[in-house]
């Protein structure tokens, strides 16, 4: 096998090599059954055991309380923007949303189709380079829930604190930072996360929802989008994305082998400090985000002269450092350093950036 590149893609993102090798070994013959997971009935004892183990491993990793349901659904996080409102926002109801970037805005725009949305705070006041402190928020007394995105993959903003919302359920889009460090699940009413960043391949979205929030769907909510229907049917009201579910389970096993979320969080801290410290000390590269609000998972940076962008990316590709181009809406560069991107990848990136600066700085 040729040497694997270092993949800094924002999503679908790098997967642990050990997971890929195990999936490869099991591809044609899962545990001596003579068939692939892709060929199994989702109702079979074999796949049900895969699904149950994946859920239990995720519960163990995040210490999910027993009064929360864990769902493995379809449609990605973007479908959740509507699904949340259809399940949790009553007719003529109101919800509070926090705007910290493009993904927050997409959630706001979609939810606005179903009810009144109060944008309780916006990072626009800081040009999306900082997160407004909660003392700046204007929360509604009668909100059905408060929604926010703890990490914005495009702008590179991340909360290092959990908002206080009292008795109002807190809903979080953790697509890009779930499992990256410990988090108190009991502080949330609901968490959702598209898999293709820190969980597994694209095709499945994980929903962690407190049981008292089930059974609130609107009358016209499609059956397939009703969280209670999904929970009552073990996420198998219809045929689920079995391969993505299985691969996500392998990632959970791998995370446990690394020492769990606490251990991976310490490694992620080292990774992000290594990269940000170099950028801050550099004369060629810069990151505009307020230091306490910098993302651990997605590190955007710019070169002092954007005419150097193309040669920088070409050289990176030649050195096996892939997918560093920033999102089209903001430009520049972006290194996504999720759990599966280890310190060797970050060190290789920093070494290349140093060499490029010596040549072009």
Swiss-Prot record:
GO terms for cellular component: cytoplasm. Its EC number is 2.6.1.52. Keywords: Amino-acid biosynthesis, Aminotransferase, Cytoplasm, Pyridoxal phosphate, Pyridoxine biosynthesis, Serine biosynthesis, Transferase. Its cofactor is pyridoxal 5'-phosphate. Catalyzes the reversible conversion of 3-phosphohydroxypyruvate to phosphoserine and of 3-hydroxy-2-oxo-4-phosphonooxybutanoate to phosphohydroxythreonine. Gene3D superfamilies: Aspartate Aminotransferase, domain 1, Type I PLP-dependent aspartate aminotransferase-like (Major domain). This is Phosphoserine aminotransferase. The gene is serC. Pathway: Amino-acid biosynthesis; L-serine biosynthesis; L-serine from 3-phospho-D-glycerate: step 2/3; Cofactor biosynthesis; pyridoxine 5'-phosphate biosynthesis; pyridoxine 5'-phosphate from D-erythrose 4-phosphate: step 3/5. One of its GO terms (molecular function) is O-phospho-L-serine:2-oxoglutarate aminotransferase activity.
């Amino acid at each position: 096998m040729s040497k694997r590149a270092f993949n800094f893609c924002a999503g679908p993102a790098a997967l642990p090599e050990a997971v890929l090798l195990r999936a490869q070994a099991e591809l044609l013959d899962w545990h001596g059954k003579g068939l692939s997971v892709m060929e199994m009935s989702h109702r079979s004892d074999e796949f049900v055991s895969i699904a149950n183990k994946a859920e239990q491993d995720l519960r163990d990793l995040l210490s999910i309380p027993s009064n929360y349901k864990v769902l493995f659904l379809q449609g990605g996080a973007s479908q959740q923007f509507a699904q949340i409102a259809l399940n949790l926002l009553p007719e003529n109801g109101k919800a509070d949303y926090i705007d910290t970037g493009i993904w927050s805005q997409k959630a706001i725009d979609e939810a606005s189709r179903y009810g009144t949305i109060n944008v309780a705070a916006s990072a626009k006041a800081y040009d999306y380079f900082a997160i407004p402190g909660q003392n700046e928020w204007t929360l509604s007394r009668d909100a059905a829930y408060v929604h926010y995105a703890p990490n914005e993959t495009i702008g590179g903003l991340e909360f290092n604190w959990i908002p206080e919302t009292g008795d109002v359920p807190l809903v979080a889009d953790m697509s890009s930072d779930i499992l990256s460090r410990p988090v108190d699940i009991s502080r949330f009413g609901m968490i959702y996360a598209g898999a293709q960043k820190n969980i597994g391949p694209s095709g499945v979205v994980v929903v962690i929802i407190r049981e008292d929030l089930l059974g609130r769907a609107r009358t016209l909510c499609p059956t397939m989008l009703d969280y209670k229907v999904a929970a009552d049917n073990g996420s198998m009201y219809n045929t689920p994305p079995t391969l993505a579910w299985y691969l996500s389970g392998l990632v959970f096993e791998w995370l446990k082998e690394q020492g769990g979320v606490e251990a991976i969080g310490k490694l992620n801290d080292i990774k992000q400090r290594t990269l940000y410290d170099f950028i801050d000390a550099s004369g060629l590269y810069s990151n505009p985000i307020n230091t306490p609000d910098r993302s651990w998972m997605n590190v955007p940076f710019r070169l002092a002269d954007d005419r150097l962008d193309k040669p920088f990316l070409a050289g990176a590709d030649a050195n096996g450092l892939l997918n560093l181009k920033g999102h089209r809406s903001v430009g520049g560069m972006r290194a996504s350093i999720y759990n599966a991107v280890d310190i060797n990848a970050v060190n290789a990136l920093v070494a290349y950036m140093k060499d490029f600066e010596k040549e072009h700085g």
